């Protein structure tokens, strides 16, 4: 009998816009409560963190607008793709987050979703402040200058 080819799973789902649009102040790692078919979809890379955010309601942290495409081989009920999902944190961590987010201009933004070596899905969550347009331009300008300097160093070394 021939050996079945191993299926490759997605490494991590990254929210690329988050680092561009927000100034990251502090990061946390949280578990996420999902249905079985949602975990299978995330393993296949059929998830997106774009435009997602987290809110704190009644001492619980909820992830909003995370897109998880329904698993195509699911025989059970089909879940909504952008439903609210509960994040799993300790009470002390939630209290700390709530105290920091209550400051003006701070929000909770997911940076990436990844699997631990034990197969658990975790969300890297950040306390962030929105950047102004001129901050974004300045960041792009600095990045471009650094890239140019690196090219010159490589050329003359």
Swiss-Prot record:
Gene3D superfamilies: 2.40.280.10
Entry GO MF terms: RNA binding
Any one of the GO BP annotations: trans-translation
Protein's UniProt keywords contain Transport: no
Domain of life: Bacteria
Compartment annotation: Cytoplasm
Keyword entries, A-Z: Cytoplasm, RNA-binding
Function, as annotated: Required for rescue of stalled ribosomes mediated by trans-translation. Binds to transfer-messenger RNA (tmRNA), required for stable association of tmRNA with ribosomes. tmRNA and SmpB together mimic tRNA shape, replacing the anticodon stem-loop with SmpB. tmRNA is encoded by the ssrA gene; the 2 termini fold to resemble tRNA(Ala) and it encodes a 'tag peptide', a short internal open reading frame. During trans-translation Ala-aminoacylated tmRNA acts like a tRNA, entering the A-site of stalled ribosomes, displacing the stalled mRNA.
Family according to the record: Belongs to the SmpB family.
Protein's name according to its UniProt entry: SsrA-binding protein
Organism: Chlorobium chlorochromatii (strain CaD3)
Gene: smpB
């Amino acid at each position: 009998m021939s050996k079945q080819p191993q299926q490759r799973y997605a490494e991590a789902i990254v929210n690329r816009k988050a680092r561009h649009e927000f100034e990251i102040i502090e990061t946390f790692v949280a578990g996420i409560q999902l249905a079985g078919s949602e975990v299978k979809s995330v393993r296949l890379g059929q998830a997106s963190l774009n435009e997602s955010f987290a809110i704190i309601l009644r001492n619980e942290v909820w992830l909003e607008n995370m897109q998880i495409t329904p698993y195509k081989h699911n025989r059970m009920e089909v879940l909504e793709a952008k439903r609210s999902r509960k994040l799993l944190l300790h009470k002390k961590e939630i209290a700390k987050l709530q105290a920091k987010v209550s400051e003006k201009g701070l929000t909770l933004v997911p940076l990436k979703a990844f699997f631990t070596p034990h197969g658990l899905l975790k969300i890297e969550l950040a306390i962030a402040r929105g950047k102004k347009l001129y901050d974004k331009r300045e960041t792009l300008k600095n990045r471009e200058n650094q890239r140019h300097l690196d090219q010159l160093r490589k050329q003359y070394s």
